[in-house]
Amino acid sequence: MYIGICICVLLAALSASSTGQQTVGSMNEDPGAREIEQQNILQHPRHIRASSSAQLKPFQRIDGTSDQKAVIGAMLAKYLQTRKAGSSTGRYAVLPNRPVIDPTHRINDRDYMGWMDFGRRSAEEYEYSS
């Protein structure tokens, strides 16, 4: 956290000093140098792009019929309903092909199906192995 603040302060100081040098340098220039710079600009013109708004045309979909929009909307609604119904079981939903653990099992506080606490399992083996 402290390092991040130091880096931000350092970057702010560097950017402020660099912008300060640019403005001071341009104020201390003599008028002859400014004229030479303007002549160089006139001799070597830059190529300027046309404005992007003039090139753009409105986008129209050819295949976007109302039937397709209705089908996509229905599919999206169905997906969201199944997603909401599935989220009530928690982050890890139980898959139908996994075996169901008997509720009378000695270790019944598992978070998910693949859970294994080695300390508790070894204690179980020693405790109930008589």
UniProtKB/Swiss-Prot annotation:
Record note on modification: The precursor is cleaved by proteases to produce a number of active cholecystokinins.
Tissue: Expressed in brain, lung, testis and throughout the length of the small intestine. In the brain, expressed predominantly in the optic tectum and brain stem.
Domain of life: Eukaryota
Phenylalanine amide, modified sites: 118
Residues annotated as signal peptide: 1-20
Pfam hit, one: Gastrin
GO cellular component: axon; extracellular space
Sulfotyrosine, modified sites: 112, 126, 128
Transmembrane segments: none
Residues making up the propeptide: 21-60, 122-130
One MF term in the entry's GO annotations: neuropeptide hormone activity
Keyword Cell cycle: no
InterPro entries on file: CCK-like, Gastrin/CCK, Gastrin/cholecystokinin_CS
Compartments, as annotated in UniProt: Secreted
Miscellaneous remark of the record: Frog brain contains CCK-octapeptide (CCK8) and CCK7; whereas the gut contains intact CCK33 and CCK58.
Functional note: This peptide hormone induces gall bladder contraction and the release of pancreatic enzymes in the gut. Its function in the brain is not clear.
PANTHER family: CHOLECYSTOKININ (PTHR10786:SF0)
Family per similarity comment: Belongs to the gastrin/cholecystokinin family.
Protein name: Cholecystokinin
Organism: Aquarana catesbeiana (American bullfrog)
